[in-house]
């Protein structure tokens, strides 16, 4: 019960921080981002199993602790992962932690990006119209990332893999969400 109360208080504080457009009421903690991501993947295991999907996690072997707001970080990546599980229609989601980026890639059908672009910052109004059911979640992710000093972009998987040949993923259809950390 105490953990539930603490979790609810953290959620309320995080939502207030979002509404106030400040992180002054939250405490940044030295954290291994890989631990947060691994916990999210574990939390979503039953959902992914029920959908016949697998979430793969690749950590950065040279990872250093970084100051993070745990609740906001969990909201950002939890939302992106849940969207991938709910809308990709694929069989796998890959989460790749690199030095200053996190890639979340699915092998689903993808979406038509506006104006035939292959990359789209998640702030565009037009993008929200293209992705039914995602709009509010992606707006929240974009706002959280902005408050954290991060940037988030959505890529066509094939385009991204053609332009980033250092990423070891199969050349399939799908989407890649990249969160650029500060």
Q: What label would you give each PLM region?
A:
Residues 111-126:
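Short conserved segment of the HATPase_c
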Residues 49, 54-64:
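Conserved catalytic submotifs in the C-terminal HATPase_c
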